[in-house]
Structure formats: C-alpha cells, structure tokens
Amino acid sequence: MRIVPLQPSITLTLAALTRLDTLSACTKYCLEALPELATRNLQIVHDSWTADTEEIRRTQPDLVIASVPYRIESLAAILQSGLPILTLAPHTLADIYKDIRLIAAIVSAQPEAESLITQMQSTIKSTRHRSAQRSQTPVVYCEEWGNPLIHSQSWVAELVEAAGGQYLGTPGAQTTPEAIAAANPDVLLFSWCGAGNRVPLERVITQRNWHHLKAVQNRHVYCIPDQHLNTPTHTLLEGLACIAAATHPNLHPPHPELIQLQKSKLNEVVEQSDPDPSPASASSAK
C-alpha cells in the first residue's frame, strides 16, 4: 500500500499506528508536523488546498487521503483524474475515532488504533474528572480564524466542555468582534489555522478594542499552537491540556506551549494592517 496524505492529521495518525512505511509522499506541512520524515527522502507534494494532480500521480500512490480543511476544486480534480482518493471530514471526536479506525483498517493496524483511541478517551475522561472539582464554569471563546472571525470546530467545543468550560457560540460559524465583546467571555483562546503559535495577542486585542473584556482584564487570553486544536487526530490531547490549563489553572498543570497575553505590551502596540494570516496559509491547518 502506497499512501499520499494531504494533511498532517493523516500522517500523524499513520505514525501513531506505526505505518509510516506506507507513505509514498507527503506535504511540507506533514514534514513540519513530523520532522523525522526528512530521513525518508519522500517526495513533497502540495496539500489538499492546492493539490497538483500530476504531481501526485508521479508518486504512484495506491490511495490519496485528504482531510479538513480542503478546497473542493482540488479534490474534485484528483477524483476526475482517476486517482483513488479518500476524503475525511470529521466534525466531532466520535468522527475522529471513526477516521482513525478507517485508516487503521486500510493499513492493517486495527489493534494499534484501538489502543490509540482508548488512550484518547482515557485522557479526556481523566481531564473531565479533575475539572469536575471546579467552583465555576467559565465561558470560553475559541477562534480558529481571524479574518473573518470563525469559531473553532465542534471537536474543540467538546474539549472545552471536558476541560470544565462553556463553549461560546456555534462551532465553525462566523462571528464579529462586536458579538464577542457583547458576550464578554471569561477566557479567550486563539488557535489560527496555519499560524502555529504566532497569533499576535496584544495587537488583536488592541485592533478589536477588547481592552474592557473581563478576559483581557484578568489576562485570561491565550494562544494555543494551531496543530494542537486544528489537527483532528490524537494530538488533540495536547490541545485539551492547553485548554484545561487556561480554563482552570488551579486544577490543571501549566502547559509549556500555552502563550499568555502580556498586558504590558498592549500600550506598545501600534495600529497596523490586519495581522491575520492569508487564506493560502489555511492549508496548513490539519
């Protein structure tokens, strides 16, 4: 079996299943997510946002696997070319478990999949149990895109609930700075697709005039590396740990990759152009 994964979530899943030997190529974002791939000398192909059919064909795959986010036109071109393609579109944690099992069935790694899923479920259950000791349930705004503002996906809402928070808004829906300001959430979490850990928190707060929000006043504003929340596979457990640390720091240990707002920098921010990533960078979301 020769597989071309078009998103890091697929590659990371194959790695967890110990089936990286099935890869015939990968994207640059897969390589960033799993640097050890560099030793395999795999051909680098474009991802599911900008996929190149002929480029993929040259790797002679038995199967191309794509996942969210993707551009319909790119996947349609692959399908029309006759290349075998499997497209995954998970929304919930249950969907992610199903996708892991599906990938495992393709590469004959069912026992590894069940072990991985059990680990995910156990960690989520443990986090939920610890969060049950909370004295309050803070309202949490999670943002996966900054222009326009877009709420994080449904699986993130589930992670927020497991961490002891109340998810604000409709998962995956657009919103506005005014709507979020009116809701005045207790915690602000930013995890922009394709931005890694580079969301400019102080600039965002200043440009949206959110200084008065209680989350800002209390410094409950954080950036979570996007691969921890936007990659639908087992690595979401890191995102859960970040959310838990941000939502209930008295109950959960700090996370080394959780970046907190520095209020001292707010007054230093000079109004600039929109800092949000370009649409092209969305393809690195997993």
Question: Predicted regions span which residues?
Answer:
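N-terminal ligand-binding lobe of clamshell/alpha-beta domains
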Residues: 1-286
